[in-house]
């Protein structure tokens, strides 16, 4: 099965189209902070003419430490998403970790994300598929690009072909990730591909009880991914990354969002303006 494009509230997500930004914050820390971050993203993306989907998690169920902040939970999280959606008129993407969450989440958000560590969990895949929502599948750090076909097939067998694939890095020894650009390009043969340029900066477990990251290289890594010609970019930002409750070492400073996205848009426009070059 090959999926050429999916539509998110009228936004065309396809590898040949102008890139779509899936961006926001890692985890909902408070209603006020979420509103502030969403407002800034909306202002910047409207100014630059970039299609936009707001992202945040209501529960980080896979934290390194049992003592780490997880989020406000399903009920409170959905209330915040509803307010963001109605206030700013933007689509929403969030992740689910258990089958029972899929249906209530689908009634509020527009894209449901399948976490990388759970991407082979068939019961969760089926529950998500049955909602009919657009699904963003994070590629597990331990799978090859061609293995993503099996996950797409699971969704298809359950009646859902509205699939996006998301690259977020591959394990490279302990506490390290690398991004295989050739593998990301290969995934374009199966579905629209977006690049999680935030979590690909991670050093999982690099701080013993939490992940470390390489925020200083946020632009370099994202530019590398955009050069392939992909459907979208997935990023997280925070007004004060050092104080973020999850993945601060990977988060883009919120005040750098506009110049960062301006570079990505310029590169996306350039790459997609090239005449396709067949070298095989």
Curated annotation (Swiss-Prot):
InterPro entries: Aldolase_TIM (IPR013785), DAHP1/KDSA (IPR006218), KDO8P_synthase (IPR006269). It catalyses: D-arabinose 5-phosphate + phosphoenolpyruvate + H2O = 3-deoxy-alpha-D-manno-2-octulosonate-8-phosphate + phosphate. GO terms for cellular component: cytoplasm. SUPFAM superfamilies: Aldolase. The keyword Transferase applies. The keyword Transmembrane helix does not apply. It is found in: Cytoplasm. Keywords: Cytoplasm, Lipopolysaccharide biosynthesis, Transferase. Signal peptide: none annotated. It comes from the Bacteria. This is 2-dehydro-3-deoxyphosphooctonate aldolase. It comes from Colwellia psychrerythraea (strain 34H / ATCC BAA-681) (Vibrio psychroerythus).
